[in-house]
C-alpha cells in the first residue's frame, strides 16, 4: 500500500496541449468493479496509489468539461489544470458507499474549481484586451493628477502622450473604476460545511460566470486603487500578471515556470496570491 503520493506529471498540461490530451485519452477507463476496489482502498486504507490511479483514469473528463469554458479568453491548459485540482478534491472525498460512479460525483468539484478560476481572472482579462488598452492600463495612473475623473483637457493630454485616441482613454478610465467580484465560498476551502452541496456550483444555463460577474459589477472605486495595487506587488508577481493577462500573447503557466525555473504549480500559486493581493488592495 502506498501512503505517499508520487508526482503525477499528467496533472499539469505542458506547452503541447494536443500531446497532453492524447496522453490522457490513452489512459484506460476503470470498470465499475475496478473503481470500487480502488475507492475502497483509498477510503478505508488511505492508499494514495489507489487515489493516483483514480485521478489518472478520469483526466479525460476534465478535458471535456474544460472545453465548455473556452469562451472567456483564458488558456485551455489553465482551465484543465484547475479542473484537475477539482478532480483531486473529489477523489479525496469520494465515498464508495454512495452508490454513484466517481465521474458523476466529481463533475461538480471540477466545475467548482473552473468557475472560481474564471471569476477570479475574467475581469482582469477584459479590462485590457487590445494593445492600446494595455498601454493605458499601465500608464493611465501615472498620467492622472487626482483621483476624480479626467476632464477633457486631461483626456486629450493623456491620449497625445500615449499615442491613442481620446475615446480610448475614456473607455479605459471607465473600465478601471469597476471592482472584481469574489466567489464565495472559495473553491479551495477545507471546511467541509462549505461543500455540503457541491451542486451549488452547477452551471445555471440562464447565467454564465461572465454574466454573473457583469451583473454584480459596481462603479464606486477609483482607478488609482488598481494601479497602486499593481505597484505594490513584487516584481515577479507583477510580471506574472502582466505576462498572463496583459501581454499581446498570453503566457501559459508552463512558459512562466521555465522562465523562473520553478514548477507550473508554483506559478499558479504565485498568480493566485498576486490576484488575491490585488483584490484586497482594490477593495480596501
From Swiss-Prot:
Domain of life: Bacteria
Record localization: Cytoplasm
Oligomeric and partner information: Interacts with the RNA polymerase core enzyme.
Function statement: Sigma factors are initiation factors that promote the attachment of RNA polymerase to specific initiation sites and are then released. This sigma factor is involved in regulation of expression of heat shock genes.
Protein name: RNA polymerase sigma factor RpoH
Keywords per UniProt: Cytoplasm, DNA-binding, Sigma factor, Stress response, Transcription, Transcription regulation
PROSITE patterns xref list: SIGMA70_1, SIGMA70_2
Residue segments, region Sigma-70 factor domain-4: 229-280
Amino acid at each position: 500500500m502506498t501512503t505517499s503520493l508520487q508526482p503525477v506529471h499528467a496533472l499539469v498540461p505542458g506547452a503541447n496541449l494536443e500531446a497532453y490530451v492524447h496522453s490522457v485519452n490513452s489512459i484506460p477507463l476503470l470498470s465499475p468493479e475496478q473503481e470500487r476496489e480502488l475507492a475502497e482502498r483509498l477510503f478505508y486504507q488511505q492508499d494514495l496509489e489507489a487515489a493516483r490511479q483514480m485521478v489518472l483514469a478520469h483526466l479525460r473528463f476534465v478535458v471535456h468539461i474544460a472545453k465548455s469554458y473556452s469562451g472567456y479568453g483564458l488558456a485551455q491548459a489553465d482551465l484543465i489544470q484547475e479542473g484537475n485540482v477539482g478532480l483531486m478534491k473529489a477523489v479525496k472525498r469520494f465515498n464508495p458507499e454512495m452508490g454513484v460512479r466517481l465521474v458523476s460525483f466529481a463533475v461538480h468539484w471540477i466545475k467548482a474549481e473552473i468557475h472560481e478560476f474564471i471569476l477570479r481572472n475574467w475581469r482582469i482579462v477584459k479590462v485590457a484586451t487590445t494593445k492600446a488598452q494595455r498601454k493605458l492600463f499601465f500608464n493611465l495612473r501615472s498620467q492622472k493628477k487626482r483621483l476624480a475623473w479626467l476632464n477633457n483637457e486631461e483626456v486629450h493630454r493623456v491620449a497625445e502622450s500615449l499615442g491613442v485616441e481620446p475615446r480610448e482613454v475614456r473607455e479605459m478610465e471607465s473600465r478601471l473604476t469597476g471592482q472584481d467580484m469574489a466567489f464565495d465560498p472559495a473553491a479551495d476551502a477545507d471546511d467541509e460545511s462549505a461543500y455540503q452541496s457541491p451542486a451549488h456550483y452547477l452551471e445555471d444555463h440562464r447565467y454564465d460566470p461572465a454574466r454573473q460577474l457583469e451583473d454584480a459589477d459596481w462603479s464606486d472605486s477609483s482607478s488609482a486603487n488598481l494601479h497602486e495595487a499593481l505597484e505594490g506587488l513584487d516584481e515577479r508577481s507583477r510580471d506574472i500578471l502582466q505576462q498572463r493577462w496583459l501581454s499581446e500573447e498570453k503566457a501559459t503557466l508552463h512558459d512562466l515556470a521555465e522562465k523562473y525555473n520553478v514548477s507550473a504549480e508554483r506559478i499558479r500559486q504565485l498568480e493566485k496570491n498576486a490576484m488575491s493581493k490585488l483584490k484586497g488592495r482594490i477593495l480596501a
